[in-house]
Amino acid sequence: MNEVKFLSVKLAEKLDLSAIASVFNVTRTVKWQEVLLIDHELVELVLKRPVEKREVYLYSFGVATFVDFTEAEIRDFLAFIAQIQTVNYDDFAMYYDHYEAVVGDYGEWIVTPTLTIPFRPMIKHIAEAVAKSTGFMHTEAHLNRVMDSVEPMITKLAAGRSRITKTTMRIVRETIVFKFKLTRNLKLFERPSDAEFDNISREGYDWLSNHFELDERYQINAQKIETLKRMVYQYYHFNQNRKVRSLYIFEVFLLMLFPLVRMLSDRLPLMLAWLLRS
């Protein structure tokens, strides 16, 4: 019996899987697939030493899952990836998750004392579950920060206690961009279709999903994104109302100005005559 360690880390906002695949000379049969497997033979080429059962799963949403790597091996692999695209080491240090799979002498994953599943077919599913947990961690933190910035601004606008400044516009612009990124990435975190599993592997993935609370976190993030959308709509609503109100005030000003202009125009000849006599 032994433990196989899965470590997922956030490397970038988005990983360019096509660029990485071309460096490794890996043919991606389906370009839109959101995961790229670097098997142990390719890992050996990067680390320049023999390694057993090391694999890396790279996901387009910027997360990598290392299977049974040591810390030194992870550092060496990241140094190689950094030559292909920028690695955000700040995110790497902040957003990560892990899981240790207990594997029996006959190659079975001992999920619980009453549930065992063949380990090898489940590796990709375990890697995906840990990667999604890490991705959620990053999304949750950024989503909370954005909402903390936007909510007070919307409240002040609603109360008429805030002007639409360059800072306000910048926050809203960043919020809109972030909202679209979240909406796109959240689709990648959706539950896999039943076609990807047989009955046994489905049971294993269900256990992983419960362990990392993936379904609950997906729903919470989806609800927060909807709240963020409503906040942006409120901003446009208040902004539009403010423009309409400004036009109304200007219209009232013009209506008040017309009688004055007419009065002055009627008396203008008399005023000119008086000035000339003076």
What are these regions (language model features)?
Residues 1-121, 125:
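Short Lys/Arg-enriched alpha/beta "domain-start" segment
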Residues 20, 76-80, 135, 139-142, ...:
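Hydrophobic side chains in well-ordered alpha-helices
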Residues 20, 24, 77, 81, ...:
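Generic structural signal of hydrophobic/aromatic residues within well-ordered alpha-helices
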Residues 27, 84-88, 146, 150-153, ...:
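Short secondary-structure junctions and interdomain/linker hinges
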Residues 116-184:
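Membrane-proximal low-complexity regions enriched in glycine and acidic/polar residues
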Residues 159-258, 262, 266-272:
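Membrane-associated alpha-helical segments
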Residues 272-278:
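Membrane-interfacial helical/loop segments at transmembrane boundaries in membrane proteins
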